């Protein structure tokens, strides 16, 4: 919150009337003082006042004030009334230092003196700014000058009061009754005031309020320096409106630059009637210009009980970043024992920062992780690193293991100019067991491999060129070493002219696939075999490396109307390979009856005719008007067969069948296999759209009709491969490929929205040839737009048509019984009352009769603090030996405490699994922010 300091004039040219008046210092104006004096500005800038002849000599009675007031006018236990009688003073105002940091109810029973508005009196717009668990909000009232941004030396001074008196000899103006002083954005109010012209000082007594941009200070007595805006308010309470923060102090001082100093001050985000937590310090400083506060000899109190002491603390008073400790987290697992992480954040500059993560692990020692982030006008990125001298000896004899365990990485995106873009994503780890043994706070995307990629892209008007170098480092010992692309060059685009509406486009690629296979046999101390990498089991063409060039020119003629379209397409697909095969690969070619040719090419035409129609009508369902669409689509695809069994597979797989598969040009991903096709895809989509554009429901269904068997397959899935494997092992349970059927499974995809809060989506694939469901899923999601705190997810997934890569053979195979997916996933966040919610998730695998993850707990949330307590069970993966991947169950109890305005105290790790496990959790938290 930026606050501009207020500077009063050196000479305070007072203008007093019975209402609000203004005066510029150079103006020679006539002044009247509430029918008491006739005052004029003298030549020296002082006052020249004389009593009016018919003036009433009596001012309204002076308000009685507390014994704590510094004003001499209010001192003593009694005052004299107009008739000379003695009037007893009102009961002594309670000191804020005696209230334990709570707001003084004696000033107003409903805390309106702090601009507190209860929830039931807030407007709809104001309610949208607070959580459902908040009982109200601090609302700054609209007042003249509150948004005044003019320089203080150019701002006039305004004074108003019900009555006034001026002592010319002492040059003191006395004001009484609803006194208001305002200059620029600063305003001071009180029951009465004395303005000392010689000292440029004002003294206000009774119900004092000092307002500045977004801040209010309330007290019994105030001293204001009129030439620079300094002020002191005694027995003070304060509010920072936007931060929803308040506090109190023996006295509060406002400096010339609008910094607030509190003596024996408190700070909290709790509501006026509550003190769940309070930060108390001998000297507290609040700087609205920077958004931070400091406190010395500070004590954190929870329910008035001291729980933490620090000689100095630096804390935020708004949402701006600051250096300091972040919420620590602790846990206990079998791998690390008790773990404590105490992150420290460095706010180095507006465009770069750093975070240090000291991680103490009882079983492994002290690990240091660090992250540096930067942002410039043309680039952004992250640099991270970690180091641990591991004292755990569990993997002491494992290959590729060292007690010095480390990680370093760089992510960078740089726009060299409007057309050139450079990207780097490089991470390296010390050993393949790193993520199995150690947690990380560095945001690594995968725990089975790390990416090592650099890309340079140029975007022209009609083309895009890209130079890419990409490698991977495995973080497991049970997978085959992946291929590296060193380099990969692509050039894609279209011709700028379209003769007769014909569009010409092209796609080109050159890539070098390489990898270093690990064929070593690792031995135990006694000389026996300990294990081998999966690389050692690769045979034949699976051990190939080489270059691949792919050219794909094409032309199409889109013909589009409002009622439909027809687009014929013709492409030419040419691929050339220059291959290498090591000696072990050549020796084992006969294993799968393969042939190696170092130079191969493949050329194929592709013909596609895509067409669709669009129909719509107005209809009524359940009393609601809809626009229903009917969108039939047909696509014919022809690609001739060409034998590709002796071409190795570098980056190709076959995605699972779905409704989107109907419209693919190639049933394989990657370019090492181009599927033969002579087929017609038919599909239809219908939608129900309301008059406001809201799509209530959609349903799509379709099927492919084959005019020829699909002969091109991945290694291990062709009829020849399956026959060869059966001949070697007649008892082998192998699934027959569905390549000679004249039709595909029926593919369905649908979505229905009960309203904007409830929706269900589903996909379903049923094979009429086997009368079996090959895959399907149904997902239900509930999250109201106006109350995203309510979240319900329920889903079920089934799939038995998967294909997987077998690292022990280096070939693909159909999923076996153990690979069938039958899982349900249920998660919920539900408020029981505005402040209490339950959180839970249960993910279960019916095929293996086991729980994959389950957690449950509760959350308490208020305007000033939050608590979560969650019990969690989950499966972890651990490589104890080559080709031996063990799954083990972990359990943990996670506690998270957040003191709003100070940040979390413990347990930020809960955020990670809640965000990953519950769809809608992030939207809920973003709305709360």
UniProtKB/Swiss-Prot annotation:
Its main location: membrane. It is found in: Cell outer membrane. Pfam families: LptD, LptD_N. GO terms for cellular component: cell outer membrane; transporter complex. Residues 58-101 are annotated as: Disordered. Residues 1-33 form the signal peptide. InterPro entries: LipoPS_assembly_LptD, LptD, LptD_C, OstA-like_N. Residues 66-90 have a biased composition (Low complexity). Keywords: Cell outer membrane, Membrane, Signal. One of its GO terms (biological process) is lipopolysaccharide transport. HAMAP family: LPS_assembly_LptD. Together with LptE, is involved in the assembly of lipopolysaccharide (LPS) at the surface of the outer membrane. Component of the lipopolysaccharide transport and assembly complex. Interacts with LptE and LptA. Belongs to the LptD family. This is LPS-assembly protein LptD. The gene is lptD.
